[in-house]
Design a protein with these regions (language model features):
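Membrane-helix boundary elements
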Residues: 108-132
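C-terminal transmembrane-bundle signature of multipass membrane proteins
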Residues: 80-83, 141-221
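Membrane-interfacial loop-to-transmembrane alpha-helix junctions, especially the N-terminal start
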Residues: 29-44, 95-107, 156-169, 219-221
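Hydrophobic alpha-helical transmembrane segments of multi-pass membrane proteins
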Residues: 10-22, 34-58, 70-81, 111-116, ...
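Non-cytosolic membrane-interface motifs at loop->transmembrane helix junctions
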Residues: 61-72, 126-137, 188-198
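Internal transmembrane alpha-helix with an interfacial aromatic "cap," most often the third helix
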Residues: 18-28, 53-105, 114-121, 148-151, ...
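Hydrophobic transmembrane alpha-helical segments in integral membrane proteins
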Residues: 1-20, 69-70, 127-138
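A mid-sequence, solvent-exposed acidic-amphipathic segment
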Residues: 48, 123-154
C-alpha cells in the first residue's frame, strides 16, 4: 500500500468537497470576503493535493525537488493569514492597552513552530533544499497561527463576531499543526503517521468551511 498516495487522495477529496461547498455558499452577492478567503485556502489545498496525486501516479515521487503541489500548502496558509489579518483583525482588536496580553499570549504559537523548525531542520544535517522548503512553510504557519490563536482567545468586546468563529479558529490551528507534523513525518519517512495526518486533514479542511458558515449564521441570527 502506498501510504503517501492515499494520504494525498484523502486530503484532496476532503478539501475539494469543502471548496465546492464553500463556493456554493459564499460566492454570491453580499457574502463575506472573509468566508471567501477561507474557501480559497481550502481550494489551494485541494488542487495542490490533486497535483501531488497525479505526480505520484505518473512519476512516483513528490519529494525529490520543488514542485507545484508545495504551493498548495503555501497558498492555503497565505489565505488563512490574510483572512484573519486583513478582513477580521481590525474589527476585533482596537489596539487598546487593556487588551495587550491578548496580543502577547498568541506569540506562543509561532514560537513553538519556530522551535520545531530550528531543532528538526535548520540545526540538523538536512539538505539545504529541505531546510529552505521547511522554512518557507514554517514562516507561513507562524504568521497564520498567531492570528488564529489570537482570535481564539481574544475577548469579543464590540461586534460579537469573533465568539462565533472560535470553532473555525481552533480547526485552523489544528490544520496548521498538521502541516508541520506532515512536514516532519514525510522527512523521516513515517508513512503510517503521514497517512493518519492525511485523514485528519481530509476531515478538518471541509470542517473549517462548515464552521465559518455556522459562525456566520450564529452571528447574524
Amino acid at each position: 500500500m502506498n501510504w503517501y498516495l492515499w494520504a494525498n487522495i484523502i486530503t484532496a477529496v476532503g478539501a475539494l468537497g469543502g471548496f465546492i461547498y464553500g463556493g456554493v455558499l459564499f460566492f454570491r452577492p453580499r457574502k463575506a470576503v472573509y468566508a471567501q478567503m477561507i474557501t480559497f485556502a481550502v481550494g489551494c489545498m485541494a488542487f495542490g493535493r490533486i497535483y501531488q496525486v497525479i505526480r505520484m501516479l505518473t512519476i512516483h515521487d513528490i519529494s525529490s525537488q520543488f514542485h507545484l503541489g508545495f504551493l498548495g500548502v503555501i497558498g492555503s496558509l497565505l489565505f488563512l493569514f490574510s483572512a484573519n489579518y486583513g478582513a477580521m483583525d481590525g474589527l476585533v482588536d482596537d489596539k487598546s492597552k487593556e487588551l495587550r496580553k491578548y496580543r502577547i499570549i498568541p506569540l506562543a504559537a509561532p514560537v513553538l513552530f519556530l522551535a520545531i523548525y530550528l531543532i528538526f531542520f535548520l540545526f540538523s544535517d538536512q539538505p539545504l533544499r529541505v531546510k529552505i522548503m521547511a522554512g518557507v512553510i514554517t514562516v507561513n504557519v507562524m504568521h497564520a497561527s498567531y492570528f488564529n490563536l489570537k482570535h481564539l482567545i481574544f475577548p469579543d468586546v464590540e461586534y460579537g463576531v469573533i465568539n462565533c468563529l472560535k470553532g473555525y479558529n481552533l480547526l485552523a490551528l489544528i490544520f496548521e499543526l498538521l502541516c508541520v507534523a506532515e512536514m516532519l513525518t514525510m522527512n523521516r519517512d513515517f508513512q503510517v503517521l503521514t497517512f493518519v495526518i492525511g485523514i485528519l486533514m481530509g476531515v478538518i479542511l471541509p470542517m473549517m468551511v462548515i464552521a465559518v458558515n455556522r459562525g456566520g449564521k450564529k452571528w447574524s441570527a
